[in-house]
């Protein structure tokens, strides 16, 4: 395994951050989340030696706080790929029903092409912690790790499948250079938005661009 894959990656959930690592301006709810033993999520930002860029998640989209976690403090790490079996077809919210419906197709795609996929966002957080953060109208956030180029016609075919699910699905293609939305790559746009540790920029080929 390449050394960089041993490091925490964007969307990984990490346990072990203490409240004393929060900055003085951190909101009270962020300290309460950490005191309850809940994880932080790795965010996409330039690395600092020995530190991981993370975000503390509270209730709702308005409760997000950026922070830095010492790498040495990590006690547990859960990657999006470890959460793919958490969907249910009956009796749960729309995002988890959508996950159950989509899982066989993504599993087959990954077996065929040697890829990996995972669950991120609120669905990933809920599956990893048991804390209910999803509602019937929540989105389902996913990632697909694609080290080699994915043809745009294949991206469009996958997007068309996502559009048939019972909730909006936001799938990010994780390339060696960063992340691009499947929805963008499936479009006819000449350039798409690539999100990398150094920031976001428009590129023609998100596989050939080298992240700074």
Curated annotation (Swiss-Prot):
Protein name from the UniProt record: Phosphoribosyl-dephospho-CoA transferase
Active-site residues per Swiss-Prot or TrEMBL entry: 139, 141
HAMAP family according to UniProt: Malonate_MdcG
Catalytic activity, as annotated: apo-[malonate decarboxylase ACP] + 2'-(5''-triphospho-alpha-D-ribosyl)-3'-dephospho-CoA = holo-[malonate decarboxylase ACP] + diphosphate
A UniProt-annotated Pfam family: MdcG
Stored InterPro entries: Holo-ACP_synthase (IPR017557), MdcG_C (IPR049180), MdcG_N (IPR048903)
Residues spanning the signal sequence: none
Broadest EC class assigned to this enzyme: transferase
Function: Transfers 2'-(5-triphosphoribosyl)-3'-dephosphocoenzyme-A to the apo-[acyl-carrier-protein] of the malonate decarboxylase to yield holo-[acyl-carrier-protein].
Keywords recorded for this protein, A-Z: Nucleotidyltransferase, Transferase
Taxonomic lineage of the native organism: Bacteria, Pseudomonadati, Pseudomonadota, Gammaproteobacteria, Pseudomonadales
Record-stated family: Belongs to the MdcG family.
GO MF annotations in UniProt: nucleotidyltransferase activity
EC number: 2.7.7.66
Gene that this sequence comes from: mdcG
Keyword Nucleotidyltransferase among UniProt keywords: yes
Keyword Nucleotide-binding: no
């Amino acid at each position: 395994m390449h050394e960089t894959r041993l490091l925490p990656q964007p969307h990984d959930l990490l346990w072990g951050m203490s409240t004393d690592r929060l900055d003085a301006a951190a909101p009270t709810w962020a300290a309460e989340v950490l005191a309850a033993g809940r994880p932080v999520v790795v965010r996409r930002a330039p690395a600092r030696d020995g530190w991981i860029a993370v975000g503390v998640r509270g209730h709702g989209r308005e409760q997000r706080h950026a922070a830095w976690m010492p790498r040495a403090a990590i006690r547990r790490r859960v990657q999006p790929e470890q959460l793919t079996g958490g969907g249910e077809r009956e009796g749960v919210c729309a995002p988890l029903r959508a996950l159950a419906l989509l899982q066989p197709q993504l599993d087959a795609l990954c077996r065929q092409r040697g890829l990996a996929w995972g669950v991120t966002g609120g669905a990933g957080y809920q599956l990893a912690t048991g804390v209910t953060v999803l509602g019937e109208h929540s989105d389902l956030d996913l990632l697909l790790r694609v080290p080699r180029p994915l043809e745009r016609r294949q991206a469009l075919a996958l997007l068309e499948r996502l559009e048939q699910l019972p909730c909006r699905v936001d799938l990010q293609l994780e390339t060696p250079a960063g992340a691009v939305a499947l929805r963008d790559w499936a479009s006819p746009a000449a350039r798409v938005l690539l999100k990398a540790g150094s920031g976001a920029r428009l590129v023609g080929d998100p596989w050939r661009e080298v992240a700074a």
